[in-house]
Amino acid sequence: ADVKGTARVNVTGGTLKGVVGGGLSYLYTIAALTDAAVTTDVKNVAVNITGGTINAMDHNSGLDGFGIPASVVGGGVAYSKSTVTTNKVEATVGNVDMTIAGKGAKLSGDIYAGGFAHGAKTAASVNSTRLTIADATLGAADSQVNVFAGGYAAQGATSTVKTSEVTIANSKIFGNVYGGGNKADAQSNVTVESSVITLDGADVTGIVSTESFEPSVNAALMRLAEADTGAGDAEANKPQRTINLINSKMGTLQISAKQDTETSLYLVGSNTVGEITGGKASEIVFDGTGTPAGEAILTLTKEGASFD
C-alpha cells in the first residue's frame, strides 16, 4: 500500500520489537516466479519516540521469519527470498523526520535513518532523512547502540539515501556514529549521497566516522556545533569532509581514507578525543583553535593523523 500523505508513529511507552517508519515490501517465495513486482511508496514519515523499550526487530509473518539488526529504521523495509533477477521488490520513502528524545526511550538495537533491504533485486530508498537525538542516553557499556545516517543492505540488495542530517544534542551514545550506512556483504550496495552530522554537547563512547564500515558517503559534512564553521567550497570533483569539534567527547574520530578526499578538522573549546584514525591517503588540512583534552598533542599531516 502507498501513502500519499504522512505516516506518523508516536511511541511514548510500552515494549516493542522495533519501529519502521516506511512501508513493508515482502516477496517470500523461492519458486520460479518471474517479473514479480512488490512495491511500497510513502511520501513522508514522521517518527517521535519519547519513551518505551524498543528491542531489535524479529519479524515472523507466519510464512517466514527473519531478524533485522536494528531497533529503529526510518525508511521502509524491502525483503525478498527470490533469486530471480527479473523480480523487483522496492520500499520507497520521500522524506523521513525522526526524533528520539528524553531519558525514557530505551533501545537495544541500532538506529538507521535510511531503509532496510535484503535480497537480490531488492531496494530501499529515501530521498531525505532528518534524525534528531536529544537529551537521551542510548545503549550501555555492555550493549552498544550505533547510529547510521544511511540504511542497511544484505544479500545483494541496495539501500540509498540522497541527503541525511543527524543531530545529537546533550546526549550520550554508548556506541558509534556513522555518516554512511551499513552493508552485510560485498554483493550489496549502500550509498548516502550527502550527510551532515552535528554533535552538540554529545558524548559518543565509540567511533565518530565520516564513513561507515565500508565507505558509502559521496559527500559528507560533519558539524559539532550549532553553526557551520567549516571550510569553503570543495575543489572540483574532490569530495570534502569537514569536522568541527566544539566541546565534544568521543572515543575515536575516524576520517575518510579515500585518496581523493580532503579532510578539514576544526577544534574549538575543550574536546576529548581518544585517538584519530584514517586519512593516510587523504590530504588533511588543519585550521582551527584548541587542543584535545589531556596531555596529547595533535599531529595532522598528509601521511596521517595521530596523537603524539
Language-model features: where?
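Surface-exposed loop/turn motifs in large extracellular/passenger domains
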Residues: 1-110, 115-146, 150-176, 182-308
